[in-house]
């Protein structure tokens, strides 16, 4: 398992992110808030996690929504997946949005998202006159049907 250094600046009682099952790809991350926050319909907010991390070079952390919050309450994230770069050292925060028609209250220590550690590789673009051809060609959105 890859080790990632973390500086914790969380409120008392807020748990560190953890994998909820043995096969989980993402670690559930919690709201580092002292008091409940109520999001009105279509409102968005930046929720602190209380964590600063030192991601190893060549990796990123992706910030993703939790499927249960999305299907049950219409709560998801903007800028999904969000990328945390290896050279960022500030507090990790999550952009939460309420897409439902009803207000939703985020409680202190509530699981609000997931962190997934991914290996990345930087690329360099090389300008060419023509690209090699493929069977698909330039067929884009909806090219395979419904």
From Swiss-Prot:
Gene behind the chain: dut
Keywords: Hydrolase, Magnesium, Metal-binding, Nucleotide metabolism
CDD domains on file: trimeric_dUTPase
Reactions accelerated catalytically: dUTP + H2O = dUMP + diphosphate + H(+)
Entries under PANTHER family matching the protein: DEOXYURIDINE 5'-TRIPHOSPHATE NUCLEOTIDOHYDROLASE
Similarity comment: Belongs to the dUTPase family.
Enzyme class: hydrolase
Protein name: Deoxyuridine 5'-triphosphate nucleotidohydrolase
Documented EC number(s): 3.6.1.23
Pathway membership: Pyrimidine metabolism; dUMP biosynthesis; dUMP from dCTP (dUTP route): step 2/2
UniProt organism field: Fusobacterium nucleatum subsp. nucleatum (strain ATCC 25586 / DSM 15643 / BCRC 10681 / CIP 101130 / JCM 8532 / KCTC 2640 / LMG 13131 / VPI 4355)
Named cofactor requirement(s): Mg(2+)
Role: This enzyme is involved in nucleotide metabolism: it produces dUMP, the immediate precursor of thymidine nucleotides and it decreases the intracellular concentration of dUTP so that uracil cannot be incorporated into DNA.
């Amino acid at each position: 398992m890859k080790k990632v250094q973390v500086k914790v600046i969380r409120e008392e009682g807020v748990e560190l992110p953890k994998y909820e099952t043995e096969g989980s790809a993402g670690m559930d991350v919690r709201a580092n808030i002292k008091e409940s926050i109520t999001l009105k319909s279509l409102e968005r907010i930046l929720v602190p996690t209380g964590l600063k991390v030192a991601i190893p070079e060549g990796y990123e952390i992706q910030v993703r929504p939790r499927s249960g919050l999305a299907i049950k309450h219409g709560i998801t994230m903007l800028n999904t997946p969000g990328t945390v770069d290896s050279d960022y050292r500030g507090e990790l925060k999550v952009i939460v949005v309420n897409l439902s028609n009803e207000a939703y209250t985020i409680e202190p220590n509530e699981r609000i998202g997931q962190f997934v550690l991914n290996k990345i590789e930087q690329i360099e673009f090389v300008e060419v006159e023509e690209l090699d051809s493929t069977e698909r060609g330039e067929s884009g959105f909806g090219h395979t049907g419904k």
